[in-house]
Amino acid sequence: MRPLAVIGSLSRDVVAGSEPRIGGGSWHAARALRALQLGATIFAKCGEPERRDYQRRLTATGLPATLTTGGDTTGFSMSYDERGIRTMTVDAVGEPWRARDASPDLLRTVEWLHVAPLLRSDFDADTLKRLANGRRILFDGQGLVRVPAVGPLVLDGDFDHDLLRHISILKLAEEEARAIIGDAELESLTSLGVPEIVVTFGLEGSLVLARGTATRVPAHTVDADPTGAGDAFAVAYLAGRADGHAPVSAARRATALVAALLTGRAR
């Protein structure tokens, strides 16, 4: 597999009234990579109060990890209904990533990079342009549509379209896709100009838009806490693409791997 990395902020999550715990795309991706025995480098960011604990947790994954600190740690409160639909509140907005936070020297061997923003403010177009130099980017659509404001999480399509020029693969949850295109057919997402788009439907699988075709990939039914499943799917998908799988094959592989991960059967 070609060199793979994940970059994104960590979060402080409160799930269904529980004690705060570490979260964020880079964390859930790291856990998935460890469980699936896939190698990658992790670049993460958080506020100073969480630095020591979060560094320890990243180190425990056994993956090479660099933790940058600055500003607040992004905070969320969330709950799930019986269908796995999540309701979220933004408790704190973290500091954006800047180009200096991920040194070119650290990224020089990386060919496939999963960019895992929590909110729209995490990565601007200039930072993403630098990250995309010489590598393929899978970008989580949270970084397009999640409004960076404290309170109930708001999604809208008011993002900088210049970001799209630097994205090779765009991963969107269905509600994120709807924030962009409204009630239009999901196939209309191809008008964004991103070569490869994957829309996920939680417990109902995904849709792959690539190479001029739209292909539904069914999910594997599991009874488990779905927190982090989208991040695990994204990094497993990118690992499949880095390993030479075509888009639909990578989605099927990622679906099976995430189901195994959620049910504790990952290799």
Model-predicted regions and their roles:
Residues 31, 76-79, 206-209:
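Short beta-strand scaffold segments in enzyme catalytic cores
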Residues 154, 158, 184-267:
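Conserved phosphate-binding/catalytic region of the ribokinase-like
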Residues 2-4, 11-20, 35-116, 121, ...:
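Conserved N-terminal subdomain of the carbohydrate kinase-like
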Residues 8-10, 232:
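Active-site metal-binding loops of divalent metal-dependent hydrolases
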Residues 30-39, 240-243:
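Alpha-helix C-terminal capping segments
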